[in-house]
Every structure is written in structure tokens, then in C-alpha cells.
Amino acid sequence: MLQRSAPSTIPNTLARRIFMQRQGLLAPPTPKQTKADLQRLIEQLGFVQIDSIATVERAHHMTLFARNQTYQRRHLTDLLENDRALFENWTHDASMIPTAFYPYWQRHFQRHAEHLRTRWQKIRREGFDAMLDDVLGHIERDGPVMSRSFARDEKKGS
């Protein structure tokens, strides 16, 4: 018979310190954050939630700035759009996730594919399958693209 050991405990101060370190909030200030530094930070975090509302500033910029005050937006844009070191998907909300983690997301994509297709068919109604086929055909022909590579004449929310 297996013996159960008592659960490990650590003091609250150590638990807080571990949490803060894993969230990138204990690192000393650096002279200047490079694009590679930013990529390592996002990999450490696992993802950065995207916020499209900018009351003061979009939250993902504030999240990254809080971890390094030399954060530069252009590095995030480069990582996402030019280097393709990040991809957008839903964690619990829209997020930027390191492309290095993409293989770990494959099972999630497969598990939810049919549910998402059915949901989008209900939302988009007539023409959804043809639109999806067009998008997939475009990607097969031209490789990975951003959403802005597609029609701009469609109203948002339609």
C-alpha cells in the first residue's frame, strides 16, 4: 500500500516571492529591453492577454511595461507580425501566445474544432462554409497570413 506523505508547505512570503518572480515582476531594471528579452518574458508568462480597449493604454502594453519600463511596442509588433514568434488565439480571452508553444495547442485545436465550426455556422449563417474554404485556400496557397490580409469591406461584427 502506498503511503501518503503530508503536503508540502511553504511560508506565505516565499509563495508570494515565487508568484511575483514567475510573473516577471521581480526582475531588476535592465538598461534597455531588447526584442529577444521581450520574447523571453512572454514565454515566461505563457501568453499575454490582448485588450482592444484603450482608456489609458491597451492593457497588454501596460502588462509588459509593468515588467520592464523600457518596453517598446514595436518589439511586440515585430514579434507578432514580422518574426511570427507569437500567434493569436483564445486562452480564456484573446491572447498572444509564443509560437514555440504552438505544438502544445494542437490537441486543443483538434478537440474544439467541430464545436467552433458549429458555433460559427450559427453566428455567420449562410455562406460560412464558402468563406472558410476561401480562407483555408488562401492560407494553403500563400502560407500563414494575418486577418488583415482578407476583405476589408465587411462591417465589423457582421
Q: For each predicted feature, which ranges?
A:
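Phosphate-backbone binding and catalysis cores of DNA-processing enzymes
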Residues: 2-158
